Curated annotation (Swiss-Prot):
Record function comment: Component of the cytochrome c oxidase, the last enzyme in the mitochondrial electron transport chain which drives oxidative phosphorylation. The respiratory chain contains 3 multisubunit complexes succinate dehydrogenase (complex II, CII), ubiquinol-cytochrome c oxidoreductase (cytochrome b-c1 complex, complex III, CIII) and cytochrome c oxidase (complex IV, CIV), that cooperate to transfer electrons derived from NADH and succinate to molecular oxygen, creating an electrochemical gradient over the inner membrane that drives transmembrane transport and the ATP synthase.
Protein name: Cytochrome c oxidase subunit 8C, mitochondrial
Record note on quaternary structure: Component of the cytochrome c oxidase (complex IV, CIV), a multisubunit enzyme composed of 14 subunits. The complex is composed of a catalytic core of 3 subunits MT-CO1, MT-CO2 and MT-CO3, encoded in the mitochondrial DNA, and 11 supernumerary subunits COX4I1 (or COX4I2), COX5A, COX5B, COX6A1 (or COX6A2), COX6B1 (or COX6B2), COX6C, COX7A2 (or COX7A1), COX7B, COX7C, COX8A and NDUFA4, which are encoded in the nuclear genome.
Gene label: COX8C
A cellular-component GO term for this protein: mitochondrion
């Protein structure tokens, strides 16, 4: 087992990081307290509409003009 311990590529990688003085980054700490009130139904509906409109509008445009795209 001692030979295996010295040949582990992950261990060599961490040794290289230590030689460079790099440390793994700390996890992100939230900058503020959590939201105190839950989202209302209207806020959630607006968010979903904006989200789906953002992604589905370009797809609908491409599918609607597919014949033009095929000609080029």
């Amino acid at each position: 087992m001692p030979l295996l311990r010295g040949r582990c590529p992950a261990r060599r990688h961490y040794r290289r990081l230590a030689l460079l003085g790099l440390q793994p980054a700390p996890r992100f700490a939230h900058s503020g307290p959590p939201r105190q009130r839950p989202l209302s139904a209207a806020e959630m509906a607006v968010g979903l509409v904006v989200f789906f409109t953002t992604f589905l509008t370009p797809a609908a445009y491409v599918l609607g003009n597919l014949k033009q795209f095929r000609r080029n």
